[in-house]
């Protein structure tokens, strides 16, 4: 038996000097060390009756749940580069094993098959070779006609034209994406916050390949795979990291469904209460119930209301004390007018579709404390704000852990979810779904959570706040240079916006389309004024990308017809 250290990038294999040649008694342990000089994967092999019980090198560790097959197997752990060459230690415990007993499932053997690792390396190399050619450029003349036909077909089959002529070619590089007309854009909207690692990210592709060899395309409430458990445990651990009590999690296929489940939980808990409190300009999703909650009358045109909603004014960053006082006064008026009728208070910690207005600890505490006192469940909608501030959740960023009864996430998490407290746990079978998510969504969701952590996105001086500060500084400079075209910046963390021109929708859309043609993707939000917003991908955005975005914005403002 030996501990092998393999260099994934070069294919060179290096074994430790000390080779353990024979198995020990059942329950005995042996250790082996190897000094690391570059990023590697560590694996144990050739041990017919042992399992790897501990594998450590400073802050990284192997997964002890993955045991070796008789005679052959791998247990891997990513090891970062350290200039002082740390030592990896593997401790192996010998276990009793009958001839017909296996420490792995057949599926584990498939996942650990070296041929799959080789296939993933080949795919990554091929994508990298082709994606390296991508940089912002206009459409290819030879592809324009066919692309226009595709857009016409899309418009016909969906019953109306898309907001902009976007059909991806299927290839990208970080925040850069190639369209089917050969043009390349700097994507700083990312599906309105979905593509947190950008496009064609190697880690996300590898996770999707792992999902592709699973037994089903979809997971559900009745039948699901272990990755669902891992995803739910990761989300609840993140949510409870600073004091919130949110031990339960239900996966779902969209942010709207996550919000539907949140309201079901709250209304079930507070029955017969039937009213909901929300903020002006709230956006909760496109389902029937969420259209009622959303404060956009044109989004529910011709649709009956499903439950009564009362709206509070959101925090005004220009007048925080006065707007807080107005919101609190209105809250007390409504609680007095409808005693015992409120089933939930639904809130985005950072108003997204409403115009990228940030909340604050003081503002939300002034509202949430009387709501807690009145026994009204508090729902934080983090479908757009998750992963974009100094903490994984914006409610943590604002220090609101004590008030979180139910929290929803989505978009960047790839699979959406509703987290809730023990007190909110339903007493009846009101929560169930045929689909909890695609197998690939769950696998890439786990990869995304890992990437956000490994990219040092969080913390007061983390990547999110650094990139956000740089982006806002660049927008502030443009506001000085083009005072009639740019007001702002606005937002919080990696949710950044500015008000273009007179703040009208028509002007904002005109500039948005002009930026699209130049090669920068942003999107409108808000209503009065209408703003242009950006959601850079946190797991891949660098200072060079921020600088390029400001350069393209400058070009767009200077050449706006």
Feature locations, PLM:
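Generic detector of N-terminal low-structure segments
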Residues: 39, 60, 70, 74, ...
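Compositionally biased low-complexity segments enriched in histidine and/or tyrosine
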Residues: 41-43, 512
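Residue-identity detector for glycine
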Residues: 11, 24-27, 46, 71-73
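Low-complexity, intrinsically disordered or signal/transmembrane-proximal segments
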Residues: 14, 30, 34-35, 49, ...
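Short linear motifs in low-complexity or flexible loops
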Residues: 4, 10, 15, 21-23, ...
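Conserved N-terminal phosphate-binding loop of PLP-dependent enzymes in the Aspartate aminotransferase
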Residues: 84, 90-561
């Amino acid at each position: 038996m030996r501990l092998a250290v393999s260099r994934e990038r070069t294919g060179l294999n290096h074994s430790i000097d000390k080779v353990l040649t024979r198995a020990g008694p059942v329950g005995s342990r042996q250790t082996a060390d190897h000094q690391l000089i570059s990023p590697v994967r560590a694996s144990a092999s050739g041990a017919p009756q042992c399992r790897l019980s501990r594998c450590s090198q400073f802050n990284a560790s192997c997964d002890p749940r993955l045991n070796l097959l008789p005679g052959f197997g791998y247990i891997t752990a990513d090891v970062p580069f350290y200039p002082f060459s740390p030592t990896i230690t593997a401790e192996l415990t010998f276990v009793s094993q009958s001839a017909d007993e296996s420490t792995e499932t057949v599926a584990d053997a498939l996942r650990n098959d070296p041929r799959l690792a080789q296939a993933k390396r080949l795919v990554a190399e091929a994508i990298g070779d082709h994606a390296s050619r991508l940089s912002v450029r206009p459409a290819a003349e030879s592809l324009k006609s066919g692309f226009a036909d595709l857009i016409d077909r899309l418009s016909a089959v969906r019953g109306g034209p898309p907001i902009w002529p976007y059909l991806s070619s299927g290839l990208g590089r970080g925040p850069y994406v190639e369209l089917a007309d050969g043009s390349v854009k700097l994507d700083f909207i990312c599906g309105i916050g979905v593509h947190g690692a950008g496009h064609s990210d190697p880690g996300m592709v590898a996770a999707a390949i792992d999902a592709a060899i699973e037994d089903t395309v979809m997971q559900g409430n009745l039948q699901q795979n272990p990755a669902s458990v891992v995803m739910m445990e990761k989300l609840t651990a993140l949510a409870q990291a600073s004091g919130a009590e949110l031990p339960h999690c239900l996966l779902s296929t969209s942010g709207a469904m996550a919000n539907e489940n949140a309201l079901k939980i709250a209304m079930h808990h507070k029955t017969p209460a039937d009213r909901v409190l929300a903020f002006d300009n709230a956006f909760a999703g496109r389902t029937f119930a969420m259209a009622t909650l959303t404060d956009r009358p044109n989004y529910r045109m011709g649709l009956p209301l499903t439950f009564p909603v009362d709206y509070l004014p959101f925090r005004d960053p220009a007048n925080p004390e006065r707007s807080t006082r107005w919101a609190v006064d209105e809250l007390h008026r409504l609680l007095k007018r409808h005693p015992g009728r409120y089933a939930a208070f639904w809130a985005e910690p950072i108003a997204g579709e409403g115009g990228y207005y940030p909340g604050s600890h003081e503002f939300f505490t002034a509202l949430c404390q009387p709501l807690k006192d009145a026994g009204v469940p508090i729902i934080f909608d983090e479908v757009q704000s998750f992963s974009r501030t100094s903490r994984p959740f914006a409610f943590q960023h604002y220090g609101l852990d004590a008030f979180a009864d139910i929290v929803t996430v989505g978009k960047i998490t790839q699979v959406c979810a509703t987290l809730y407290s023990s007190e909110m746990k339903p007493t009846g079978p009101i929560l169930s779904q045929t689909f909890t998510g695609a197998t690939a969504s769950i696998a890439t969701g786990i990869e995304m959570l890992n990437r956000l952590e490994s990219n040092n996105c969080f913390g007061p001086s983390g990547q999110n706040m650094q990139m956000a500060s740089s982006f806002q500084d660049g927008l502030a400079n443009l506001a000085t240079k083009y005072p009639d075209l740019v007001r702002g910046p606005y937002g919080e963390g990696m949710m950044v916006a500015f008000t273009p021109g007179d703040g009208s929708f028509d002007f904002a859309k005109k500039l948005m389309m002009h930026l699209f043609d130049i090669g920068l993707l942003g999107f409108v939000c808000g209503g009065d004024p209408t703003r242009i917003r950006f959601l850079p991908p946190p797991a891949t955005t660098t200072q060079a990308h921020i600088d390029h975005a400001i350069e393209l914005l400058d070009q767009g403002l200077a050449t706006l017809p």
